[in-house]
Amino acid sequence: MKRNLLCLLAALLIIGSPLMTSCSSSEDTVESPAKKEYFTQWNTCEALTALKQYVEDVTDPKSDKFIPVEDRIATFDMDGTFVAELYPTYFEYNMLEYRVLDDPAYRDKAPEDVRQAAQAIRDFVRKGTPLPSGFDMIHAYAAAKAYAGMTLAEFDAYVKAYAALPANGFKGMTYGGGVYQPMKEVFDYLKANDFTFYVVSGSDRFICRALAEPLGIAPNRVIGMDVKLKSNQEGEVPGVNYTMGKEEYLVRTDELIIKNLKTNKVLQIAQEIGKVPVLSFGNSSGDCAMHNYCLGNKKYPSAAFMLVADDDQRDHANLAEAEKRRKQWVEAKYHVISMRNDFRTIYGPDVVKVPFTFPE
């Protein structure tokens, strides 16, 4: 009996077991991550076609464009790239305006320069008054002061509480919920194809962490504007001369370290990631240096994508500015994503654009 069983096993190995053949056939029909359809919220467009072809090429071990998993690095700007920036302005601008002019816990304590920065934002969104020249830095210094003294947990809670408020200019959406649904699909697609992606934003790093958390983006993959931190007991002693105790905790200071825009994005990528990205996504001139750094990758094929906010039906948009930017990005050889033409939805079917409203 035993001899007969051994003969049967030998015969199966020679001619091939039907069961084994069935398993092999099943595996052959499984879609690779690069070929599976992830993009249900996109229309067919040049940018999406280019992205899918790129990913298929660089994830194919037989391709001369193949990129090892450890070098599949993608960088994403945040505001206007995967998070709304027109409700009615950037999240961090909206929050500073509230903090300084409306928050009863702080509004009477705000220094004059911080108050002026917040008022400039209010006049910009309510009256259309142009922001002062160099307002990126004016805001950065004001924000550093406005949240100084908060612990990291307190600031995180403050950001999330503001993010839970209804977004001005939309029905059915909170500030934190203002995420471009098609771009979430890009995250899922890249993750399935073993890319590591980083948020590289001009907004405060800890604001970005709070907004990126619901998307499953880890805190250590978020780079942004930074202020100096210190121990709550450190006082004026430099950190290099101070030993933090077990019961102490970190607080924000009013000292700005870096505003993470333009070439500063490249410097931060080099310092914190240590590799040149192969994919880059953005929406403004503040992202061009990051894109160019990516496209200058000497080791691997690379690609850069720019979103254009050209949909004034489902979002708040400046069409003249959008067209101007579109031409710039085409000339720069970036792939252009049109929110109007390429996105089947922006925020989801239950979100409706409405006019901005402001208190009297």
Task: Please place each PLM-identified region on the residue numbering.
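Compositionally biased, intrinsically disordered low-complexity segments
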Residues: 17-18, 357
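Residues in and immediately flanking transmembrane alpha helices
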Residues: 15-16, 90
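Non-catalytic pre-domain segments flanking phosphatase-related domains
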Residues: 9-12, 19-78, 86, 100, ...
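A metal-dependent, Asp-based hydrolase signature
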Residues: 87-90, 94-176
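C-terminal cap/substrate-recognition subdomain and adjoining C-terminal extension
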Residues: 29-39, 56, 65, 71, ...
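Bacterial N-terminal signal peptides that target proteins for export
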Residues: 1-9
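Electropositive phosphate-/nucleotide-binding environments in soluble metabolic enzymes
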Residues: 45, 149, 263
